[in-house]
């Protein structure tokens, strides 16, 4: 359930829940009444945004999410690493993705040394004191400084075991990564998982590549877009992913995300649920 940040749907009133034990009891009671288990608090945003009007509220939101998770007995908070600005200041994040010239090559390292590592180190230390049972799970996402196993490993080295991975395979497929190989790489650092697919249109990729500035995406023209589980990759791919998660020691939920621009949320969730159930049944039958 989300508390704000980039998410338009704020499922939880963070301030009220932090302030009032009665509000927390009411929330937990309503969840029990509807047989709903709250397994994660989501605070996706950019706490490293160079504009304080954006970065400071997102950083405060993340800490509030960690505090709330501890108060309501939830041990996972999902967010992203964030992305800082460049060396020369400015109010816009700079995503260092491809070292075309020497300046680009050194940018990520500068961001890591001066922004990412200090922030993650301090956040991990604070979390260990304020909410020792909570893991902050970074969704590896292009546009954030932690977007693949190598960049996450650097952040993990600066923080520690209470900063892990939210494994969302949809962000790997369009970048050319194999989610199973990613799972093998990050292994026990996986603290949460999302169920979301990616539909890559090969004919459009041949003409226009994978990088696209259009948002929200137009599924009629985009080279790729997020899709319901099973509509971008088949049952074999999803069964292999579930098996890899279990092999890595992850036995938590796979939280379905709806971001398929072609269908309603209800259709997306129903399709995703059917695919994931088949994948889990195959893995269980083969065990």
Where are the model-predicted features located?
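Glycine-rich, proline-tolerant flexible connector loops at the mouths of alpha/beta enzymes
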Residues: 1-26, 84-88
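Active-site acidic/histidine proton-transfer and metal-coordination neighborhood
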Residues: 30-33, 47-164, 286
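Conserved beta-strand positions in the central sheet of alpha/beta enzyme cores
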Residues: 2, 40, 78, 137, ...
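Short, solvent-exposed loop/turn segments at secondary-structure boundaries
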Residues: 12-17, 50-56, 177-179, 265-268
């Amino acid at each position: 359930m989300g508390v704000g940040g980039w998410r338009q749907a704020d499922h939880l009133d963070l301030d009220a829940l932090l302030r009032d034990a009665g509000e927390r009891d009411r929330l937990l009671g309503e969840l029990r009444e509807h047989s709903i288990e709250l397994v994660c608090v989501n605070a996706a945003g950019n706490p490293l945004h160079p504009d304080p009007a954006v970065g400071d509220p997102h950083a405060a939101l993340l800490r509030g999410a960690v505090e709330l998770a501890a108060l309501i007995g939830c041990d996972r908070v999902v967010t992203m690493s964030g992305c800082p600005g460049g060396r020369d200041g400015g109010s816009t994040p700079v995503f260092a993705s491809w070292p075309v010239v020497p300046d680009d090559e050194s940018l990520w390292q500068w961001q890591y040394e001066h922004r990412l590592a200090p922030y993650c180190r301090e956040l991990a230390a604070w979390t260990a004191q304020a909410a020792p049972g909570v893991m902050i799970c970074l969704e590896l996402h292009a546009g954030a400084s932690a977007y693949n196993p190598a960049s996450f490993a650097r952040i993990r080295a600066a923080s520690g075991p209470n900063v892990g991975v939210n494994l969302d395979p949809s962000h790997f497929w369009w970048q050319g990564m194999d989610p199973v190989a990613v799972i093998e790489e990050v292994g026990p650092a996986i603290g949460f998982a999302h169920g979301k697919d990616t539909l890559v249109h090969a004919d459009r990729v041949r003409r226009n590549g994978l990088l696209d500035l259009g948002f929200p995406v137009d599924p009629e023209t985009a080279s790729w877009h997020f899709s319901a589980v099973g509509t971008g990759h088949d049952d074999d791919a999803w069964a292999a992913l579930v098996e890899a998660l279990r092999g890595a020691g992850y036995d938590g939920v796979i939280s379905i995300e709806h971001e398929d621009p072609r269908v309603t949320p209800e259709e997306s969730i129903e399709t995703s649920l059917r695919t994931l159930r088949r994948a889990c049944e195959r893995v269980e039958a083969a065990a």
